[in-house]
Amino acid sequence: MRRPSGRRITALAAAGLLLPALAACGSDDSGAGAGNAGNAGNKDSSLVIYSGRNEKLIKPLLGELEKAVGTKVEVRYGDSAELAAQILEEGRRTKAGLFFSQDAGALGALSKEGRLQKLPPATLDKVDKAYRGSDGDWVGLSGRVRVLAYNPDEVREDKLPDSVLDVVKPEWKDKTGFAPTNASFQAFVTGMRVLEGDDATRTWLKDLKANGAKAYANNLAVLDAVESGEVSLGLVNHYYWYERVAEKGEDKVAARLHFLPGKDPGALINVAGAGVLKDTGQSEAAQKALDFLLSKKAQTYFADETKEYPLAAGVTSSVKDLPPFASLESPDIDLGKLESLQQTLTMLQEQGLV
């Protein structure tokens, strides 16, 4: 599917020491480190949220959130992987009632360890089953799709690859940019492992490097390289382009986006989502907070601020030229399986990519 308009090194230290499976599950937009969560307030007098999404995004919603919950809300910001690892280390002593993750992998890890509470059908039914936990213990709140950014001065639209697997072909030698240390790229590779298998993914990574793909620090740097013509293609999340267009105007942005067809691994949709923690004494307040985050007001806010797709039924994005969510040809995958990021990191290290 071709459409016309086309965050930070992985958390390894703290999360890796606490839970190897989470070592690579870093947040793209996290604020301060997970240590900020350690001094959360009294859970009996307020709701405490551990948030892998940053303060700049969450703070404007706090007033409305407290009204919806009916009590004071404290938010502790950090990297999603580190926060999830901290929750597992704290066990029933955790002061968090709600975990708001930047990605599905961290939620999948908590679900796997039995730390999330089953959610009521009324909450689950607000989100398509593809974007919630298979055990019914977390839901996605907003989605982002992997795309190819391309420079139309360097490559014609009708010559674009139909699969991310094709960027290792000779015609794309030295022409592809990617961000191997970025959490979103690592989640994409994890998705490829789930969909295509470890052997095929390992071969693709080896071929990607051999084909001269250029590594950059993050998605924005990849987009910059596409813009300048340094590379013809870039592997990124969709919203970086839309944020740049909102800032500069489409006529000032050279790059365009290619939404891959056919349920390609390169069209993976990952989500930011949330789950209610078990045995914290905050279940009722946490559930109210989660339902607020699925409300039209909150969903519209996230869509407008992040350019991500709202996931609650009945809410659509107002972002100009963003393809309808239903039109995306994303692969069928259990997003909870993205928790196996440690294996991905090992694979990337073996290929000399991180």
Regions found by a protein language model. Give the residues of each.
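Extracytoplasmic ligand-binding site segments that recognize negatively charged/polar headgroups
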Residues: 51-59, 78-82, 94-231, 265
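A ligand-binding cleft/hinge motif common to bilobed small-molecule-binding domains
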Residues: 105-109, 232-254
